[in-house]
């Protein structure tokens, strides 16, 4: 997120013609990118990891192509997505991380994170896996309650868990729906 803050500050300054230290901001953004790209990569897992030095996957990595930190076609990203699919995705639902490998200080098991599931759909869209993205999106719609609302998490039996309704999840839903619609419309034109 540090990279996103600097990147968006640069974009905003350029768009609005605000004065800024061009060299310093761009150098800072580049340093952050290189640190994440090289030091948050695990060769053995072939994936970006939860934090520097860890060996744990984290579904928050799904934000990387969504915030344009990395191309959805970058080889490291494709490998990360495969690793997330293998370890954190069950059906259409995505766990934030593996509770058995990461001690978050919270007792008990976690459900799958609804927001991460919508990020996953959007990553599939941006990576060109439109049919899979559409299928997973439609399955996710089935987890909403009778009013179309989502909780923070979904349990193993499909029950809504955690904060309800959760705004972040609905933002993920809207973003995934928008991206899926845009990509499907563009595919029709080809």
Label every PLM stretch briefly.
Residues 6, 23-26, 30, 36:
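Long hydrophobic alpha-helical segments that form multi-pass transmembrane helix bundles
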Residues 9-26:
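Inter-helical turn/loop segments and adjacent helix faces that build the functional surface
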Residues 12-15, 130, 143, 183:
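Alpha-solenoid helical repeat scaffolds
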Residues 30-113, 135-165, 171-185, 189-190:
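Extended glycan-interaction surfaces of carbohydrate-active proteins
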Residues 109-129, 170:
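C-terminal substrate/ligand-recognition segments
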């Amino acid at each position: 997120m540090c990279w996103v803050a600097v990147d968006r500050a640069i974009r905003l300054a350029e768009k609005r013609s605000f004065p800024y230290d061009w060299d310093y901001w761009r150098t800072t953004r580049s340093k952050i990118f290189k640190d994440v790209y090289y030091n948050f990569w695990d060769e053995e897992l072939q994936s970006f990891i939860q934090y520097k030095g860890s060996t744990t996957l984290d579904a928050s990595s799904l934000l990387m192509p969504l915030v344009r930190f990395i191309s959805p076609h970058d080889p490291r990203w494709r490998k990360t997505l495969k690793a997330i699919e293998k370890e954190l995705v069950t059906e259409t639902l995505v766990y934030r991380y593996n509770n058995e490998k990461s001690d978050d200080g919270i007792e008990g098991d976690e459900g799958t994170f609804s927001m991460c599931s919508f990020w996953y759909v959007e990553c599939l869209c941006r990576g060109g896996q439109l049919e899979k993205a559409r299928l997973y999106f439609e399955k996710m719609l089935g987890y909403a309650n009778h009013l179309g609302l989502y909780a923070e998490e979904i349990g193993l039996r499909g029950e809504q868990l955690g904060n309800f309704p959760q705004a972040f999840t609905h933002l993920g839903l809207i973003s995934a729906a928008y991206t899926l619609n845009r990509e499907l419309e563009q595919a029709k034109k080809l």
